[in-house]
């Protein structure tokens, strides 16, 4: 989208922004509570309220008001008090789900851009869900030229703890950038592999994975 509008946007920008964006949300898979508790705690507006110093509050929205005006209206209308009433049923406080900006769960956001010989232009990792013991690891490279071959290797136990599954040619210039859900799910469902291997791909990862 940025390219179509002639806007220069590189991976390093996302790395820089995430290093300054505090990790505030205690929701699975990286946190403790199911996703519906994010709604109970106030959802996206609560996050916006915590990070509003980083936002352009003067932008116009579909309500006909600016973002800043929308956030003020929520406070005036008792939105956050209503959210706390949901959490009261579980004996929780909002801070159990969404931390204040100055008391975050972490200070490095949720993703990072990695660079190396396998991805010289950069690769994205959601580091908040990576086991700490895997931050530094030496793994065996197991390359596959399509997702189907990788799934078969996982399901037939060809992949062992200590392997790095590499799936190539699944990007936008390959097969159209399909979601790598099935391989991810096969790995996560295996008690031996879930926290002991890595998956690198030019394919797509979205909410499901």
Where are these regions (language model features)?
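Catalytic or ion-coupling anion/metal-binding cores of large enzyme and transporter domains
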Residues: 1-209
């Amino acid at each position: 989208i940025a390219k179509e509008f002639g806007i220069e946007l590189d991976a390093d920008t996302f790395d820089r922004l995430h290093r300054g964006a505090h990790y505030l949300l205690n929701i699975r898979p990286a946190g403790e509570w199911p996703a519906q508790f994010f709604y109970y705690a106030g959802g996206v507006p609560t996050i916006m309220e915590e990070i509003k110093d980083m936002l352009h509050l003067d932008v116009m929205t579909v309500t006909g008001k600016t973002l800043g005006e929308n956030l003020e209206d929520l406070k005036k209308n008792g939105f956050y008090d209503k959210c706390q009433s949901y959490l009261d049923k579980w004996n929780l406080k909002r801070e159990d789900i969404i931390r204040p900006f100055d008391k975050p769960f972490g200070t490095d956001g949720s993703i990072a851009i990695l660079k190396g010989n396998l991805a010289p232009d950069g690769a994205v990792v959601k580091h908040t869900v990576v086991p700490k013991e895997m931050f530094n690891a030496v793994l065996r490279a197991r390359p596959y030229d399509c997702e189907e071959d990788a799934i078969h290797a996982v399901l037939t136990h060809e992949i062992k703890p200590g392997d790095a599954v590499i799936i190539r040619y699944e990007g936008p210039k390959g097969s159209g950038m399909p979601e790598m859900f099935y391989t991810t799910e096969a790995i996560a469902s295996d008690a031996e592999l879930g926290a002991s291997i890595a998956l690198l791909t030019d394919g797509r990862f979205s909410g499901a994975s």
